[in-house]
């Protein structure tokens, strides 16, 4: 079995892709615009809060019951908040915690300051989108949150694929660094043949205990 480590992967990305293309995909909003222009479905943008002036005038009460807020140039799922409904005093996060408007404003301030951005320290923007629901085919595998599928291609040729499955620990986020399960997919039949949680191999999703392999 050939293993592609993170360092080698990053080296190949830098070697095989134009610098401007890499810079573009590190920005969620710009990536969405490019995908939409190419006819790829993307979630609508509720708001892009670009600076403190935007934050001061933004009407947080206008937000829907369920939404996601994330740094435009975020990394490893840091700074992503998933909101699943309104409650007295604010909103309910996907993990059950209450999020007040004051807390949300403070979070946006941290995003704008670049505390949660890929570069770290450079100014960023806060992207707000509707909360996307799990596809029924994934529903049996995850208790909540939004799984996704990642495919690594060389040109137009797919080389490997994985699905990222949120857990209670990850707060519904499909980010491995936040505690999601990473599961390798066999191209021949679409089945999962290996899964990891953190540094450990697993055979089941932790909650509920659903067999993956």
Model-flagged regions — what are they?
Residues 5-20, 200-212:
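A short, surface-exposed helix-loop junction/capping segment
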Residues 96-200:
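Phosphate-binding site of ATP-dependent enzymes
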């Amino acid at each position: 079995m050939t293993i592609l480590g993170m360092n080698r992967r990053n080296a190949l990305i830098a070697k095989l892709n134009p610098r401007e293309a890499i810079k573009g995909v590190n920005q969620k909003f710009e990536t969405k615009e490019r995908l939409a222009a190419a006819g790829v479905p993307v979630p609508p943008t509720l708001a892009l809060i670009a600076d403190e002036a935007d934050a001061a005038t933004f009407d947080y009460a206008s937000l829907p019951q369920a939404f996601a807020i994330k740094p435009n140039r975020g990394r490893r799922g840091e700074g992503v908040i998933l909101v699943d409904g309104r409650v007295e005093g604010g909103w309910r996060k996907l993990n059950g915690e209450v999020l007040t408007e004051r807390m949300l404003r403070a979070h946006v301030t941290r995003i704008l300051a670049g505390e949660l951005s890929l570069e770290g320290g450079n100014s960023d923007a806060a992207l707000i989108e509707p909360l996307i629901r799990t596809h029924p085919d994934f529903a049996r595998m995850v208790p909540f949150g939004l799984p996704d599928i990642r495919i690594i291609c060389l040109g137009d040729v797919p080389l490997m694929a994985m699905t990222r499955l949120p857990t209670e620990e990850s707060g519904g986020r499909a980010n491995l660094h936040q505690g999601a399960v990473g599961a390798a997919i066999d191209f021949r039949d679409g089945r999962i043949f290996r899964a990891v949680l953190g540094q450990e191999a697993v055979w089941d999703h932790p909650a509920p205990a659903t067999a993956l392999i």
